[in-house]
Structure formats: structure tokens, C-alpha cells
């Protein structure tokens, strides 16, 4: 696997994230498309906290609206982080925020949609899958990565195949989109490569805590490094179970230069902090961040 890396653009840091110079985030290439090595996540917009219903509802109250999403998109776009991942076509209110952010910044956003498909081996199941893919295409997605809950129904571990997957990949190609897999199950990466399916990239859960990972961290690290195509990692902060500094730093220092880390945020300020942490990890330096608040903050926490 050849890893494509654009030129490094170091930050000219100052005290406090919001005042630092905003440079373009490093990029990679997937199926001929230039992508930032940080992808915009959507769990903290759509209400998938992985903690509980109360947290889910709080996210929805805060962020499932055009204004909040637009502010976060603009924060990412300030660093040319211009690729958004998630089941976007299933959340149509997102499009208003996307178009508003694009109009305001003059920068286009690449959509990486992860639709849930009916993979029943029946005429009606196929028609329903086609209707969903038509909706994804209409929404303007560049990449269409079949959701893990759909793709994993097709896995045959005995044969080391993903049954009937080429049919769905062809449906995606026929609609002018680049096919891939939202692969929570590590075997999806292995079987895609082994059988040379038209899978141009794969999502893979990867974090320093092993959160939601189906095998050991070391095993997934090996899968990522041996993958034939670039990997889009998700859950880098284990859904808030580790700090951004720990989670993001681990991810960028243990994947390849062609791979990506998906990072979601609750606010635009969090975007700026996360980008600074990521840039510091890539440049092997300490991130320049403001100290955390504390009831009696001592000098060591300044």
C-alpha cells in the first residue's frame, strides 16, 4: 500500500488555541480523492453518546440543528478539514448546515455517507437498498460506505467471504460514488482485501482503550498496517472515555501516513483544541493548549 502524504504545514502556535494560526491539515488520498487525515465525525451531532439516553438527549438538544452544526463545520473548514462522515442522508437537516458552511467559507465539503441497507436476498430487499442508495446519491456523497450492521450480515467466516457484497458495491459504482465499508468487524477489512472486492476504504474502530473493538488493540493495529487501502479510524477517544490528548495522540502515532482519524466535537472550541492536539501529534511536539479549569488551580495546571 502506497501512502500518499501532502506537504507538512506546521502550526505557528500562540498561547491559547483560538488565537493560533490556522494552517491546512495534512492530507492523504483515497481512490484518487484528496482527503484530510482528520475527518469530521457526527456522533456528537446526531446524539450517539455511547453512554446513556440522557447524554444522547443532551447532544440532540445542543447540536441537532443547523446553527450548531454549521459552527462546527466552519471550525473544521478553517483548517481545510473538509470531509464529513456519517449516515448523512438519513439526517436531512444536516444538508442545510453543510450548504450554509460551504457558502460562508467558499470551501466544499466531501460527504462520506454510511447508509444502512436492506441486504435481504429478495427482490423487495434489493429495491429497498436501491432506494436508499438513490437518496445517498441525491445528497451528493462522494463516498458510500455500507454500514457495518448491514455488511456484517453478509460475512461468512468459514469461507472468508462477504456474500453478495460485489452486488451492492456495483450499485454504489453505478451511481457514481466510491464504494467502501463501515467495518466494525475487523474481518471485513481482511476479507475485502483477500477477495479483491471493490472496497476503496474501510472504517475501523481503533482507540487506546480497546473500546468497542472486537479483538485486541494490537491485532487491529496489524490489520490497519497491512490493509491494502487507506483506513478511516473511528472512536479515537473511546466516546469520551479518554481525553482528546491521549486518544488523538495515540491514534496518529500508531497508524500509517495514509490513514485517517475521525474526530467529532460538541462545540467549535473543541474542534480547535482537537486539531491542535492532532497537529502536535503529527509534528511530535507538545500541544499548545490553555490549562483546564479547577476550583483551586495550582501552578502545575496553569
Predicted regions and their residues:
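Conserved, mostly hydrophobic/aromatic
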Residues: 40, 179, 231
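Active-site beta-loop-alpha junctions enriched in small/polar residues
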Residues: 43-45, 89, 114-120, 149-151, ...
Amino acid at each position: 500500500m502506497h501512502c500518499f502524504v501532502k506537504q507538512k504545514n506546521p502550526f505557528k502556535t500562540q498561547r491559547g488555541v483560538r488565537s493560533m494560526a490556522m494552517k491546512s491539515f495534512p492530507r492523504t488520498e483515497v481512490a484518487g480523492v484528496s482527503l484530510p487525515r482528520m475527518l469530521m465525525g457526527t456522533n456528537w451531532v446526531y446524539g450517539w453518546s455511547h453512554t446513556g439516553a440522557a447524554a444522547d438527549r443532551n447532544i440532540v438538544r445542543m447540536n441537532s440543528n443547523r446553527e450548531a452544526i454549521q459552527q462546527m463545520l466552519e471550525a473544521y473548514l478553517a483548517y481545510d478539514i473538509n470531509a464529513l462522515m456519517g449516515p448523512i442522508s438519513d439526517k436531512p437537516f444536516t444538508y442545510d448546515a453543510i450548504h450554509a458552511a460551504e457558502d460562508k467559507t467558499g470551501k466544499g465539503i466531501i460527504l462520506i455517507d454510511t447508509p444502512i441497507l436492506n441486504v435481504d436476498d429478495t427482490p423487495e430487499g434489493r429495491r429497498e437498498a436501491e432506494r436508499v442508495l438513490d437518496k445517498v446519491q441525491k445528497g451528493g456523497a462522494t463516498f458510500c460506505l455500507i454500514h457495518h450492521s448491514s455488511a456484517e450480515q453478509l460475512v461468512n467466516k468459514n469461507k472468508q467471504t462477504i456474500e453478495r457484497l460485489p452486488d451492492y458495491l456495483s450499485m454504489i459504482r453505478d451511481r457514481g460514488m466510491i464504494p467502501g465499508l463501515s467495518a466494525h468487524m475487523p474481518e471485513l477489512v481482511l476479507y475485502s482485501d483477500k477477495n479483491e472486492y471493490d472496497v476503496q476504504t474501510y472504517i475501523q474502530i481503533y482507540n487506546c482503550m480497546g473500546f468497542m473493538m472486537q479483538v485486541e488493540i494490537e491485532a487491529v493495529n496489524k490489520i490497519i498496517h497491512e490493509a491494502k487501502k487507506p483506513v478511516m479510524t473511528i472512536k479515537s477517544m473511546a466516546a469520551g472515555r479518554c481525553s482528546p490528548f491521549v486518544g488523538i495522540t495515540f491514534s496518529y502515532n500508531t497508524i500509517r501516513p495514509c490513514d485517517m482519524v475521525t474526530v467529532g466535537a460538541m462545540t467549535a472550541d473543541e474542534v480547535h483544541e482537537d486539531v491542535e492536539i492532532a497537529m502536535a501529534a503529527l509534528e511530535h511536539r507538545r500541544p499548545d493548549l490553555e490549562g483546564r479549569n479547577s476550583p483551586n488551580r495550582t501552578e502545575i495546571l496553569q
